[in-house]
Amino acid sequence: MKRDTSRVRVCDILQVDTSDVVTIGLRGCSNITDQCVMDIINRCPKLRSINLSYCGKVTDAGVSALGAGCGQLQSIDLSFCSKLTDAGIAALGAGCGQLQSIDLHGCNMVTDAGISALGAGCGQLHSVNLSECNKVANAGISALGAGCGQLQSIDLHGCNMVADAGVSALGVGCGQLQSIDLSFCYNLTDAGITALGAGCGQLQSIYLHGCSRVTDVGVSALGAGCGQLQSIDLCGCSRVTDAGISALGAGCGQLQDIYLYGCNMVTDAGVSALGRICLR
């Protein structure tokens, strides 16, 4: 008979003194339930970080208990907790004001309501991963822009309901932003990218893979405003030409990585402009 390793490990934890435990990692422990999460909360009053990614049995009940009982929580990974909804996320927003990092990758039942609760209650957030949260739209992202001025990294890969309004709010409110992934945000245009160029001068990496509506206008805004840029992915941005690439070459002297697969309008002239960066 196959041994239930996830259950054994948690039982071992709960049989010893865990009053000083600050970090617990349970990634992929598929038999972890809400009751187990509640037991951990009761026995680990100093908990600062918990990883429950791929714990498919964990629901809003367990996450809400974390919100109510772990006011010092700073980091939580709930990626691919497929039963999680806005109710659990709202509880974190209400109770975890010190939260700095949250990963909700693949939590596709979470909507703007949950993300708005984080924006309202978690002003210390530095890192947010909403990759493939395809029900999150501009309202949720705008709430993060308004409430999370310390945000440094946000992943919106595959959030195809996010467009210029949400991204522009990040540009206005998140001046410390260093990394943003907007890959396959199909509705994004130059307006959102221009806002990032104007407001996010510390930006180091941006991923625009598949953002086919972005043109030289948006890319040139990044070149003008993001002098610390080190990595940019423009794969599939078929409207970008030499003009945009040349603007990056002129303004982004720290650029190390650029991806142009599918940029069929870029010619030798644009590549030559990038080549001049490498000679500095």
Predicted regions and their residues:
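Short, solvent-exposed loop/turn at the beta-strand->alpha-helix junction
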Residues: D4-C11, S30-M38, G56-S64, S82-A87, ...
